[in-house]
Amino acid sequence: MADLRLNYVLLEMKLKPEEDNTKKAATWSYYTRDDVKKFVKKANNYGIDVIPEINSPGHMNVWLENYPEYQLADNSGRKDPNKLDISNPEAVKFYKTLIDEYDGVFTTKYWHMGADEYMIGTSFDNYSKLKTFAEKQYGAGATPNDAFTGFINDIDKYVKAKGKQLRIWNDGIVNTKNVSLNKDIVIEYWYGAGRKPQELVQDGYTLMNATQALYWS
């Protein structure tokens, strides 16, 4: 990478969780803190910034398989380990604790929360609790997309307090009625779902071209 003058690498990986409210997630393959620190140090020596990603609120099965209490349940009561229940304050706290654990290992000024494909293979219609939560939290007429956007903004506020800038994927960003996505978030445009890039730029958002047509093989 250094020879090609590439200076960023996005690392979606699992750091061994060690906090009391996360350590049951120490399954699958993971890296230790020493492993990651050595990797980050070597990358930094070559001028490469290593950006960690824990995708949320979707794609969370490697973290939530042993935490059913944080999994989102559909209208029939069936829980999905891929989906964090953003209406549950304890589930949100769980994700923030993971951020804290990574923060002590990575030196970058960025945090990537993914935020893509939350409803892949399904729709918000099957999760009426998010509609109820959205209206309670964000007012009359709020939709699950408002709740989703509000969750992203909450994480943005959390990482900003740590001196970091939030990065997300684009496909979950839609026009919302009650909650607007924070403008300081970097949107990595990888897929043609959600709002068009021209609209986002016109509204003052910072975009990075990460289109799958060019970079996903």
What are these regions (language model features)?
Residues 1-164:
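Substrate-binding cleft of carbohydrate-active enzyme catalytic domains
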Residues 116-121, 127-217:
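Catalytic-core regions of glycoside hydrolase
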